[in-house]
Curated annotation (Swiss-Prot):
Keyword presence, Chloroplast: no
UniProt feature coiled coil, ranges: none
Family: Belongs to the universal ribosomal protein uL23 family.
Disulfide bond sites: none
Subunit-level organization: Part of the 50S ribosomal subunit. Contacts protein L29, and trigger factor when it is bound to the ribosome.
GO biological process, one term: translation
Protein name as catalogued: Large ribosomal subunit protein uL23
Entry GO CC: ribonucleoprotein complex; ribosome
Source taxonomy: Bacteria, Pseudomonadati, Pseudomonadota, Gammaproteobacteria, Pseudomonadales
HAMAP family according to UniProt: Ribosomal_uL23_B (MF_01369_B)
Keyword terms, alphabetized: Ribonucleoprotein, Ribosomal protein, RNA-binding, rRNA-binding
Gene Ontology MF term list: rRNA binding; structural constituent of ribosome
SUPFAM superfamilies given in the database record: Ribosomal proteins S24e, L23 and L15e
Amino acid sequence: MNQERVFKVLLGPHVSEKATVLADKKGQFVFKVATDATKLEIKKAVESLFSVQVERVTTLNVLGKSKRTARGLGKRNDWKKAVISLQPGQDLDFSSSAE
């Protein structure tokens, strides 16, 4: 996988209360990913970017909410979320990967 595709697959970490609990208790990390990304692409991107061994990748599609605007109803974009499970003894460090 080329370096350009790695940065297009992983859009960034998803920070929420549930994602923080998963990271603290189970060592799982949540990322926003491209909607066309596959589990294998996500696994390779995380392994190459953070130099860790990924055990499992779980993905889910999040549907955008309908919101009212001044001009009527609008809809937020759909997006894809990936939960990354690392092998035992592995940990992600977001600060050291920004080289």
